Protein backbone atom coordinates (compact mmCIF):
# COMPACT_ATOMS: atom_id res chain seq x y z
CA UNK A 1 0.00 0.00 0.00
CA UNK A 2 1.35 3.39 -0.92
CA UNK A 3 2.01 6.16 1.52
CA UNK A 4 -0.89 8.65 1.57
CA UNK A 5 -0.23 11.95 -0.16
CA UNK A 6 -2.43 15.03 -0.44
CA UNK A 7 -3.46 14.72 -4.07
CA UNK A 8 -5.48 17.89 -4.21
CA UNK A 9 -6.66 20.84 -2.18
CA UNK A 10 -10.01 22.42 -2.78
CA UNK A 11 -8.94 25.60 -4.46
CA UNK A 12 -10.48 29.00 -4.03
CA UNK A 13 -12.44 28.16 -0.90
CA UNK A 14 -12.46 31.82 -0.03
CA UNK A 15 -11.38 35.35 -0.78
CA UNK A 16 -7.71 36.24 -0.76
CA UNK A 17 -7.58 36.39 3.03
CA UNK A 18 -8.85 32.84 3.51
CA UNK A 19 -6.37 30.69 5.41
CA UNK A 20 -8.60 27.61 5.56
CA UNK A 21 -8.13 24.72 3.20
CA UNK A 22 -10.19 21.60 2.84
CA UNK A 23 -7.89 18.77 1.93
CA UNK A 24 -8.60 15.33 0.65
CA UNK A 25 -5.98 12.66 1.02
CA UNK A 26 -5.94 9.33 -0.76
CA UNK A 27 -3.97 6.32 -1.67
CA UNK A 28 -4.10 5.90 -5.41
CA UNK A 29 -4.23 2.13 -5.65
CA UNK A 30 -6.71 -0.44 -6.83
CA UNK A 31 -9.68 -2.00 -5.06
CA UNK A 32 -9.23 -2.58 -1.35
CA UNK A 33 -5.89 -0.77 -1.36
CA UNK A 34 -7.54 2.52 -2.27
CA UNK A 35 -8.43 4.73 0.68
CA UNK A 36 -9.75 8.26 0.86
CA UNK A 37 -10.46 10.41 3.85
CA UNK A 38 -11.52 14.00 4.27
CA UNK A 39 -10.01 16.42 6.74
CA UNK A 40 -10.80 20.05 7.26
CA UNK A 41 -7.90 22.34 8.05
CA UNK A 42 -8.74 25.73 9.50
CA UNK A 43 -6.42 28.15 11.26
CA UNK A 44 -6.31 28.21 15.03
CA UNK A 45 -9.54 29.99 15.80
CA UNK A 46 -9.99 32.05 18.93
CA UNK A 47 -13.63 31.33 19.63
CA UNK A 48 -15.43 34.57 20.36
CA UNK A 49 -17.79 32.98 22.88
CA UNK A 50 -18.96 29.65 24.24
CA UNK A 51 -21.62 29.63 21.51
CA UNK A 52 -19.22 30.29 18.62
CA UNK A 53 -19.01 27.12 16.49
CA UNK A 54 -16.08 28.49 14.48
CA UNK A 55 -17.80 28.39 11.09
CA UNK A 56 -15.09 29.34 8.63
CA UNK A 57 -16.04 28.66 5.02
CA UNK A 58 -18.47 27.23 2.53
CA UNK A 59 -17.05 23.83 1.57
CA UNK A 60 -19.43 23.24 -1.36
CA UNK A 61 -23.09 22.85 -2.19
CA UNK A 62 -24.44 19.59 -3.55
CA UNK A 63 -26.16 18.98 -6.87
CA UNK A 64 -27.79 15.61 -7.51
CA UNK A 65 -28.05 14.80 -11.19
CA UNK A 66 -29.76 12.18 -13.32
CA UNK A 67 -26.99 12.21 -15.95
CA UNK A 68 -23.55 12.83 -14.49
CA UNK A 69 -21.61 13.08 -17.75
CA UNK A 70 -23.98 15.59 -19.37
CA UNK A 71 -24.20 17.75 -16.26
CA UNK A 72 -20.44 17.58 -15.68
CA UNK A 73 -19.81 18.87 -19.20
CA UNK A 74 -22.30 21.72 -18.66
CA UNK A 75 -20.46 22.96 -15.58
CA UNK A 76 -17.12 22.51 -17.31
CA UNK A 77 -18.28 25.04 -19.91
CA UNK A 78 -19.09 27.48 -17.10
CA UNK A 79 -15.53 27.26 -15.78
CA UNK A 80 -15.57 24.28 -13.40
CA UNK A 81 -12.71 22.64 -15.27
CA UNK A 82 -11.06 20.84 -12.36
CA UNK A 83 -12.33 18.37 -9.82
CA UNK A 84 -11.67 15.73 -7.21
CA UNK A 85 -12.81 12.18 -7.92
CA UNK A 86 -12.17 8.74 -6.44
CA UNK A 87 -14.68 8.87 -3.60
CA UNK A 88 -16.20 5.55 -2.45
CA UNK A 89 -19.41 4.65 -4.28
CA UNK A 90 -20.61 2.71 -1.22
CA UNK A 91 -20.11 3.55 2.43
CA UNK A 92 -21.02 2.73 6.00
CA UNK A 93 -24.52 2.57 7.46
CA UNK A 94 -23.48 5.58 9.57
CA UNK A 95 -22.89 7.58 6.39
CA UNK A 96 -26.29 6.47 5.06
CA UNK A 97 -27.91 7.63 8.30
CA UNK A 98 -26.14 10.98 7.98
CA UNK A 99 -28.09 11.47 4.74
CA UNK A 100 -31.41 10.37 6.27
CA UNK A 101 -31.30 6.86 4.76
CA UNK A 102 -32.10 5.19 8.07
CA UNK A 103 -33.47 1.90 6.73
CA UNK A 104 -30.69 1.39 4.20
CA UNK A 105 -27.68 -0.82 4.93
CA UNK A 106 -25.54 0.98 2.35
CA UNK A 107 -26.18 3.60 -0.30
CA UNK A 108 -24.62 3.34 -3.73
CA UNK A 109 -23.47 6.11 -6.04
CA UNK A 110 -23.15 5.90 -9.80
CA UNK A 111 -20.58 8.70 -10.04
CA UNK A 112 -19.38 11.67 -8.04
CA UNK A 113 -16.95 14.56 -8.21
CA UNK A 114 -16.26 17.77 -6.31
CA UNK A 115 -16.16 20.37 -9.09
CA UNK A 116 -13.55 23.10 -8.77
CA UNK A 117 -13.30 26.47 -10.52
CA UNK A 118 -9.63 27.45 -10.93
CA UNK A 119 -9.05 31.18 -10.59
CA UNK A 120 -12.44 31.96 -9.06
CA UNK A 121 -12.62 34.97 -6.79
CA UNK A 122 -14.40 33.16 -3.96
CA UNK A 123 -15.64 29.73 -2.84
CA UNK A 124 -17.25 27.88 -5.73
CA UNK A 125 -17.13 24.13 -4.97
CA UNK A 126 -19.97 21.89 -6.19
CA UNK A 127 -20.43 18.31 -4.98
CA UNK A 128 -21.92 16.69 -8.10
CA UNK A 129 -23.43 13.26 -7.42
CA UNK A 130 -25.43 10.74 -9.43
CA UNK A 131 -27.20 8.34 -7.10
CA UNK A 132 -27.86 4.71 -7.94
CA UNK A 133 -29.56 3.53 -4.72
CA UNK A 134 -31.58 5.31 -3.48
CA UNK A 135 -32.42 8.12 -5.92
CA UNK A 136 -35.43 10.41 -6.10
CA UNK A 137 -35.73 11.47 -9.77
CA UNK A 138 -38.62 13.89 -9.26
CA UNK A 139 -37.93 17.23 -10.99
CA UNK A 140 -36.24 20.03 -9.03
CA UNK A 141 -38.16 23.13 -8.00
CA UNK A 142 -40.27 24.44 -10.86
CA UNK A 143 -39.96 28.13 -9.97
CA UNK A 144 -37.24 30.16 -8.20
CA UNK A 145 -39.69 31.11 -5.39
CA UNK A 146 -39.98 27.58 -3.95
CA UNK A 147 -39.12 27.31 -0.26
CA UNK A 148 -35.63 25.96 0.28
CA UNK A 149 -32.27 26.29 -1.44
CA UNK A 150 -33.54 27.45 -4.80
CA UNK A 151 -30.54 28.58 -6.86
CA UNK A 152 -26.86 29.45 -6.95
CA UNK A 153 -25.62 32.77 -8.31
CA UNK A 154 -22.66 33.05 -10.68
CA UNK A 155 -20.95 36.42 -11.15
CA UNK A 156 -19.79 37.35 -14.64
CA UNK A 157 -17.77 40.23 -16.00
CA UNK A 158 -19.72 40.30 -19.28
CA UNK A 159 -23.28 39.04 -18.99
CA UNK A 160 -24.35 39.79 -22.55
CA UNK A 161 -21.39 37.88 -23.98
CA UNK A 162 -22.06 34.89 -21.71
CA UNK A 163 -25.78 34.97 -22.49
CA UNK A 164 -25.11 34.88 -26.23
CA UNK A 165 -22.52 32.10 -25.89
CA UNK A 166 -24.61 29.88 -23.62
CA UNK A 167 -27.78 30.43 -25.64
CA UNK A 168 -25.90 29.35 -28.79
CA UNK A 169 -25.01 26.15 -26.90
CA UNK A 170 -28.67 25.40 -26.20
CA UNK A 171 -28.82 26.52 -22.56
CA UNK A 172 -32.39 27.32 -21.45
CA UNK A 173 -33.04 30.81 -20.04
CA UNK A 174 -36.17 32.14 -18.32
CA UNK A 175 -35.98 35.46 -20.15
CA UNK A 176 -33.62 37.89 -21.79
CA UNK A 177 -31.17 39.66 -19.43
CA UNK A 178 -32.75 42.32 -17.26
CA UNK A 179 -31.18 45.54 -15.94
CA UNK A 180 -28.52 48.10 -16.79
CA UNK A 181 -24.82 47.38 -17.47
CA UNK A 182 -23.11 46.34 -14.25
CA UNK A 183 -26.46 45.47 -12.68
CA UNK A 184 -27.95 42.88 -15.02
CA UNK A 185 -29.10 39.34 -14.31
CA UNK A 186 -30.74 36.40 -16.02
CA UNK A 187 -31.86 32.96 -14.83
CA UNK A 188 -30.86 29.80 -16.65
CA UNK A 189 -31.34 26.09 -15.97
CA UNK A 190 -28.77 23.33 -16.00
CA UNK A 191 -29.44 19.97 -17.74
CA UNK A 192 -31.43 18.73 -14.71
CA UNK A 193 -33.56 21.88 -14.55
CA UNK A 194 -31.71 23.44 -11.60
CA UNK A 195 -31.81 27.24 -11.49
CA UNK A 196 -28.63 29.29 -11.78
CA UNK A 197 -28.72 33.08 -11.60
CA UNK A 198 -26.15 34.75 -13.84
CA UNK A 199 -25.40 38.18 -12.37
CA UNK A 200 -23.19 40.89 -13.86
CA UNK A 201 -20.33 42.39 -11.85
CA UNK A 202 -20.46 46.16 -11.23
CA UNK A 203 -16.93 46.20 -12.67
CA UNK A 204 -17.37 45.11 -16.27
CA UNK A 205 -14.76 42.90 -17.90
CA UNK A 206 -15.48 42.65 -21.63
CA UNK A 207 -14.94 39.17 -23.01
CA UNK A 208 -11.48 38.59 -24.47
CA UNK A 209 -12.38 35.15 -25.84
CA UNK A 210 -15.86 34.68 -27.19
CA UNK A 211 -15.69 30.87 -26.88
CA UNK A 212 -15.58 30.89 -23.06
CA UNK A 213 -17.68 32.45 -20.33
CA UNK A 214 -16.56 35.35 -18.17
CA UNK A 215 -17.83 33.77 -14.94
CA UNK A 216 -15.54 34.73 -12.07
CA UNK A 217 -17.15 33.47 -8.88
CA UNK A 218 -20.23 32.58 -6.85
CA UNK A 219 -21.35 35.59 -4.79
CA UNK A 220 -24.21 33.91 -2.94
CA UNK A 221 -26.62 30.99 -2.66
CA UNK A 222 -30.33 31.82 -2.80
CA UNK A 223 -32.48 30.35 0.00
CA UNK A 224 -36.22 31.04 0.14
CA UNK A 225 -37.71 31.26 3.63
CA UNK A 226 -41.17 31.54 5.15
CA UNK A 227 -40.18 33.97 7.94
CA UNK A 228 -37.06 36.04 7.28
CA UNK A 229 -36.68 37.29 10.87
CA UNK A 230 -36.79 33.72 12.20
CA UNK A 231 -34.32 32.56 9.55
CA UNK A 232 -31.88 35.40 10.24
CA UNK A 233 -31.97 34.50 13.95
CA UNK A 234 -31.31 30.85 13.04
CA UNK A 235 -28.34 31.60 10.79
CA UNK A 236 -26.84 33.95 13.38
CA UNK A 237 -26.37 30.86 15.58
CA UNK A 238 -24.05 29.47 12.92
CA UNK A 239 -21.96 32.64 12.71
CA UNK A 240 -23.66 34.66 9.97
CA UNK A 241 -23.22 37.86 11.96
CA UNK A 242 -23.28 40.39 9.11
CA UNK A 243 -26.86 41.10 8.12
CA UNK A 244 -28.07 43.47 5.40
CA UNK A 245 -31.84 43.67 5.32
CA UNK A 246 -33.65 43.79 1.98
CA UNK A 247 -36.74 45.97 2.31
CA UNK A 248 -40.04 44.78 0.93
CA UNK A 249 -40.26 45.59 -2.76
CA UNK A 250 -42.59 44.92 -5.67
CA UNK A 251 -40.83 44.37 -8.98
CA UNK A 252 -41.84 45.78 -12.33
CA UNK A 253 -43.52 43.51 -14.84
CA UNK A 254 -40.26 43.26 -16.80
CA UNK A 255 -38.17 42.31 -13.77
CA UNK A 256 -40.86 39.90 -12.55
CA UNK A 257 -40.72 38.21 -15.94
CA UNK A 258 -36.95 37.82 -15.50
CA UNK A 259 -37.76 35.76 -12.40
CA UNK A 260 -40.12 33.64 -14.50
CA UNK A 261 -43.45 35.16 -13.47
CA UNK A 262 -46.21 36.86 -15.46
CA UNK A 263 -47.51 38.62 -12.34
CA UNK A 264 -45.86 41.23 -10.09
CA UNK A 265 -43.30 39.77 -7.68
CA UNK A 266 -43.10 41.04 -4.10
CA UNK A 267 -40.50 39.93 -1.58
CA UNK A 268 -38.41 41.01 1.38
CA UNK A 269 -35.31 39.42 2.83
CA UNK A 270 -31.76 39.69 4.07
CA UNK A 271 -28.21 38.96 2.99
CA UNK A 272 -26.33 37.17 5.78
CA UNK A 273 -22.56 36.67 5.71
CA UNK A 274 -19.66 35.45 7.80
CA UNK A 275 -17.36 38.11 9.23
CA UNK A 276 -14.27 35.87 8.97
CA UNK A 277 -12.90 33.05 6.85
CA UNK A 278 -14.22 33.12 3.31
CA UNK A 279 -16.92 35.68 4.30
CA UNK A 280 -19.40 33.89 2.05
CA UNK A 281 -22.94 35.14 1.77
CA UNK A 282 -26.43 33.65 1.70
CA UNK A 283 -29.45 35.51 0.34
CA UNK A 284 -32.61 34.79 2.32
CA UNK A 285 -35.78 35.86 0.51
CA UNK A 286 -39.28 35.75 1.95
CA UNK A 287 -41.70 35.71 -0.97
CA UNK A 288 -44.94 37.58 -0.42
CA UNK A 289 -46.36 37.22 -3.92
CA UNK A 290 -46.43 34.78 -5.52
CA UNK A 291 -45.95 32.59 -2.45
CA UNK A 292 -45.38 28.83 -2.73
CA UNK A 293 -45.88 27.09 0.63
CA UNK A 294 -44.68 23.68 -0.56
CA UNK A 295 -41.87 22.54 1.77
CA UNK A 296 -38.26 22.04 0.75
CA UNK A 297 -37.05 18.58 -0.28
CA UNK A 298 -37.68 16.10 2.57
CA UNK A 299 -35.11 13.52 3.66
CA UNK A 300 -33.40 11.40 2.57
CA UNK A 301 -30.91 13.71 0.87
CA UNK A 302 -31.13 12.10 -2.57
CA UNK A 303 -33.55 14.31 -4.52
CA UNK A 304 -32.57 15.62 -7.93
CA UNK A 305 -31.61 19.28 -7.52
CA UNK A 306 -29.65 21.42 -5.06
CA UNK A 307 -29.83 19.47 -1.83
CA UNK A 308 -27.42 20.62 0.85
CA UNK A 309 -24.91 23.29 1.76
CA UNK A 310 -21.65 22.07 3.32
CA UNK A 311 -19.91 24.33 5.84
CA UNK A 312 -16.54 23.87 7.55
CA UNK A 313 -16.00 24.03 11.31
CA UNK A 314 -12.88 23.16 13.34
CA UNK A 315 -14.57 20.53 15.54
CA UNK A 316 -17.81 19.01 14.33
CA UNK A 317 -18.84 17.48 17.68
CA UNK A 318 -18.26 20.75 19.50
CA UNK A 319 -20.38 22.57 16.91
CA UNK A 320 -23.21 20.05 17.28
CA UNK A 321 -23.23 20.34 21.06
CA UNK A 322 -23.42 24.14 20.89
CA UNK A 323 -26.21 24.16 18.32
CA UNK A 324 -28.26 21.44 20.03
CA UNK A 325 -28.18 23.53 23.20
CA UNK A 326 -29.89 26.25 21.12
CA UNK A 327 -32.55 23.81 19.86
CA UNK A 328 -31.14 23.49 16.33
CA UNK A 329 -32.51 20.21 14.90
CA UNK A 330 -30.27 17.61 13.26
CA UNK A 331 -31.08 14.86 10.80
CA UNK A 332 -28.86 12.27 12.52
CA UNK A 333 -25.78 11.83 14.66
CA UNK A 334 -22.26 12.68 13.43
CA UNK A 335 -20.82 10.15 10.96
CA UNK A 336 -17.09 9.58 10.35
CA UNK A 337 -16.34 10.55 6.75
CA UNK A 338 -15.56 9.35 4.19
CA UNK A 339 -13.28 6.32 3.70
CA UNK A 340 -15.39 3.79 5.60
CA UNK A 341 -12.34 2.87 7.70
CA UNK A 342 -11.28 3.67 11.26
CA UNK A 343 -8.71 6.18 9.97
CA UNK A 344 -11.18 8.98 9.23
CA UNK A 345 -10.21 12.22 10.93
CA UNK A 346 -13.27 14.14 9.71
CA UNK A 347 -16.99 13.85 10.26
CA UNK A 348 -20.24 15.18 8.83
CA UNK A 349 -23.70 15.90 10.19
CA UNK A 350 -26.74 17.76 8.81
CA UNK A 351 -28.51 20.55 10.66
CA UNK A 352 -31.96 21.53 9.39
CA UNK A 353 -33.01 25.16 8.98
CA UNK A 354 -36.57 26.40 9.74
CA UNK A 355 -37.72 25.62 6.19
CA UNK A 356 -36.04 22.24 5.82
CA UNK A 357 -32.73 23.22 4.17
CA UNK A 358 -29.94 20.79 5.02
CA UNK A 359 -26.75 22.42 6.34
CA UNK A 360 -23.91 19.91 6.35
CA UNK A 361 -21.25 20.62 8.96
CA UNK A 362 -17.85 19.23 8.00
CA UNK A 363 -15.16 19.20 10.66
CA UNK A 364 -12.40 17.39 12.45
CA UNK A 365 -13.28 14.26 14.39
CA UNK A 366 -11.15 12.04 16.59
CA UNK A 367 -10.58 8.76 14.70
CA UNK A 368 -12.73 5.92 16.03
CA UNK A 369 -13.73 2.37 15.10
CA UNK A 370 -16.13 2.06 12.20
CA UNK A 371 -19.68 1.95 13.61
CA UNK A 372 -21.05 -1.60 13.29
CA UNK A 373 -23.51 -2.45 10.55
CA UNK A 374 -27.03 -3.30 11.76
CA UNK A 375 -27.55 -6.99 12.54
CA UNK A 376 -29.80 -7.51 9.50
CA UNK A 377 -27.25 -6.03 7.07
CA UNK A 378 -24.61 -7.92 5.10
CA UNK A 379 -20.93 -7.33 5.93
CA UNK A 380 -19.63 -3.86 5.16
CA UNK A 381 -18.29 -3.51 1.62
CA UNK A 382 -16.57 -0.30 0.56
CA UNK A 383 -16.31 -0.07 -3.22
CA UNK A 384 -14.52 2.55 -5.30
CA UNK A 385 -14.91 3.76 -8.87
CA UNK A 386 -13.28 1.64 -11.54
CA UNK A 387 -9.85 3.01 -12.49
CA UNK A 388 -9.88 5.26 -15.55
CA UNK A 389 -8.86 3.42 -18.70
Residue ranges of predicted features:
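Bacterial N-terminal signal peptides that target proteins for export
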Residues: 2-16
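A cross-kingdom feature marking solvent-exposed beta-strand/loop segments within repeated
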Residues: 48, 87-111, 132-151, 160, ...
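Bacterial N-terminal signal peptides
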Residues: 14-25
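Vicinal oxygen chelate
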Residues: 56-67, 113-132, 137-165, 184-189, ...
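Core segments of cupin and vicinal oxygen chelate
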Residues: 64-123, 161, 168, 178-179, ...
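N-terminal beta-strand motif that seeds the catalytic metal site of vicinal oxygen chelate
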Residues: 32-72, 84, 148-154, 200-232, ...
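Sec/Tat signal peptide C-region and signal peptidase I cleavage site
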Residues: 27-30
Amino acid sequence: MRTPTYFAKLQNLAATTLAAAVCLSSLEARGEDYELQATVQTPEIAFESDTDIGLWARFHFAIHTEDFDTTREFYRRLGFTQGITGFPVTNTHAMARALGMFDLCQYELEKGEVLLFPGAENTTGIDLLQWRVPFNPEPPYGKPNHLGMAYATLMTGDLMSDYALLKSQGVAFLSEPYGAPGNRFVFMRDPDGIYLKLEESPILRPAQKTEQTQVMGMPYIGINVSDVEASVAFYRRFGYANVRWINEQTLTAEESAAWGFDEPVTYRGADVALDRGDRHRLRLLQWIAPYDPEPAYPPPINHKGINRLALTVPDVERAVAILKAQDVPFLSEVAPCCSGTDTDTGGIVHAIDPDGVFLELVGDLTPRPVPPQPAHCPPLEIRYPAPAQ
